[in-house]
Amino acid sequence: MLRQIDYIYSQPEGSYTKEGKIIPFINYQKSAPERCLDMLLAKYYGESYQSEVLMDLPEKRSVPELRCDLRKATILLITDGGLVPKGNPDRMPSTNAGKFGTYSLEEEGYEVSHQGYDTSYVEEDYNRLLPIDAMQEMEREGKIGKLCPFFLSTVGVMTSVERSIHLGKQIAADVIKNKVDAVLITSACGTSTRCGAYIGIEIEKRGIPVVQITNLTRIAVDMGVSRVVKGNNICYPCGEPKRAEEGEYLYRRRIVEKALHMLEEICEK
């Protein structure tokens, strides 16, 4: 028989210990919707409130620098937005994939396997998720040394932290084998951005600098990503469908240029 507890008080000003995933300061006599509304109103009126979500601080680590001139660097593109060749040959799941695929930049066509955003914009133009056209143009111009002729893709939506870290380790090991100098990661929705962030962190632990492009920059920063560029929208981080084709390309190019510039900056963490 469980003993009834009247209140479990918060300790926002003091230290507390966690036992597993149990949060020790929630008043469970109020329903979750009531507690959520109380927090929302407190935030709106500028009053103090205590989040029920405990986030571990990002671990302190050194931030890798680009080891060569950008004009000689080999850049790899990665996305957590579920871009796959037409027909989805690897049967990439649309949620919580837990695996990744390696695909050519020269496929005849692409589709998206991802339940975290409206994929119609990317299926209309995949460059809105993965800026292949802008990167290829910058390669031709000599702004970068080489764009890898393939990209890595996974589906980050609904992927837990633990699974994201495990996936990140697998991808990082693959990246090392391909001898690249830097990585650009493009991300979609919230949990997908979180997954992409952990992938980037694991790659950086191997000494390769990463820039993450996402509309949800706060998530990436809170996870501990060193270099983050704000994308336009979770449905098209590197696109702007309202613009004409040339205008959208120039918009995407500016995002890519900003990301590449960040690779040349020295970050302190």
How would you label these PLM feature ranges?
Residues M1-K269:
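An N-terminal assembly and electron-transfer interface module characteristic of large anaerobic redox
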